[in-house]
């Protein structure tokens, strides 16, 4: 999505909330260090009426409980100073929400992986998976089918990026 999330909406103490709050700091630092295009552009969460303003206060409380420290409540006039065409009752500004060039980020992460001796197997289906086999104890052995070609891989660490199939793949061990 190319969005750097602040951790505003998730249930208090949830993994998503913790990862967003801590992860955004790490991501911004990594992007700056590696010259990956990104911007802390912020985000306005807008309440059009009094009922929505009450909901916005609940969102603010949840965010603060999750460790989001930079939210700012805006009056109608303060919000309009940022966005003159905006019609609202109130708004919540999240200045640490941002955007990142996901393509640049992925290429940089891939370079880091390869520099560390790792490899990426794209468009490959895991045919079999065994843990604790091979020369090194705890090794993971995979049989992978990529473009009709069977390959056997052995690794100490495997990142399961199977999307919606990730849980099913994890249960195959």
Predicted regions and their residues:
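Short low-complexity, flexible loop/linker segments enriched in glycine and/or proline
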Residues: 1, 55, 87-88, 135-141
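Short intrinsically disordered, low-complexity coil segments enriched in acidic
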Residues: 1-4, 35, 140-141, 153-155, ...
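Dinucleotide-binding Rossmann-like beta1-alpha1 core, especially the glycine-rich loop
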Residues: 3-78, 82, 88
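Short linear functional motifs in flexible/disordered or boundary regions
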Residues: 16, 91, 170-171
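Amphipathic, soluble alpha-helical interaction motifs
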Residues: 30-33, 119, 172
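Short amphipathic alpha-helical segments
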Residues: 58, 170-173
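Helical element adjacent to the flavin cofactor pocket in flavoenzyme catalytic cores
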Residues: 92-157, 161-168
């Amino acid at each position: 999505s190319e969005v750097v999330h602040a951790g505003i909406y998730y249930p208090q103490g949830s993994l998503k909330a913790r990862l967003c709050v801590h992860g955004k700091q790490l991501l911004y630092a990594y992007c700056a260090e590696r010259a990956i295009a990104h911007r802390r552009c912020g985000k306005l969460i807008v309440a059009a009426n009094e009922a929505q303003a009450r909901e916005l206060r609940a969102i603010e409380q949840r965010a603060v409980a999750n460790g989001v420290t930079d939210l700012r409540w805006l009056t109608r006039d303060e919000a309009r100073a940022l966005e003159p065409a905006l019609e609202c009752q109130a708004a919540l500004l999240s200045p640490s929400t941002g955007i990142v060039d996901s393509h640049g980020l992925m290429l940089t992460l891939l370079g880091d992986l390869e520099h560390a001796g790792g490899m990426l197997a794209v468009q490959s289906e895991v045919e079999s998976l065994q843990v604790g086999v091979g020369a090194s104890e705890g090794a993971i052995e995979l049989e992978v089918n990529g473009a009709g070609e069977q390959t056997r891989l052995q690794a100490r660490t495997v990142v399961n990026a199977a999307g919606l199939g990730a849980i099913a793949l994890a249960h195959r061990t």
